[in-house]
Amino acid sequence: IFPIFSIFFGIVFLKEKFNRNKIFAIILVFVSILYLILQYKVLPWIGLTVALSFSIYGLIRKKINIDSSIALLIETLLLCPFAIIAFLFLMKLNLNIFSFSEVKLSFYLLWAGPMTLIPLYLYTKGLQLVGIGPASMIFFATPTSQFLLGTLVYGETVDAHRLISFIIVWAAVFIYLNEIRKE
């Protein structure tokens, strides 16, 4: 859902150029999402909220002409007080899981920062180099790898509706990326 919002924002707010095939690919993804919503009769509120908020973030980052490193530093400094308040609140409720008594958990927590920061930095660098639409296409990789991992490795069953949606989305991604390659 996120790449669709980002591409839409690129067209509307950044005046990015899209030919007929790219627009067709966008419509295919939208149809795929709409198909799943109609089949399951559930609106994915969480997915829509996350996708919309991250698309707005990408749009703002694309519009503001600041180096990625400096912008991430500013964002981190702005969010730091909220993180400290949340941390103190958890400590007050005795929900402090941030103790260093368990080595494995401490290792995971220490690496959570870089594992979040590095992809975010690379994404914002990509926004500076290309349009918001092409930069957002990488976000089809995560649900695809989760889908393949779930079905091929963990043996999860996939109903026909999800399979149809998956095929439509990847046909759209192929069309879109093929158009980018031609440019």
Region annotations inferred by a language model:
Residues 12-14, 64, 71, 126, ...:
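Hydrophobic/aromatic residues within transmembrane alpha-helices
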Residues 1-4, 68-78, 117-152:
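Helix-helix packing/entry segments at the starts of transmembrane helices
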Residues 3-8, 51, 55, 84, ...:
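Hydrophobic/small/kink-forming positions within alpha-helical transmembrane segments
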Residues 31-34, 38-39, 89-108, 151-160:
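Membrane-interface helix termini and inter-helical loops of multi-pass transporters
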Residues 20, 72, 77-109, 117-130, ...:
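Membrane-interface interhelical linkers
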Residues 4-52, 62-66, 166-183:
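Juxtamembrane helix-loop boundary signature in multi-pass membrane transporters
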Residues 39-95:
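Transmembrane alpha-helical segments that form core, pore/gating elements
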Residues 140, 144-183:
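C-terminal-most transmembrane helix of multi-pass membrane proteins
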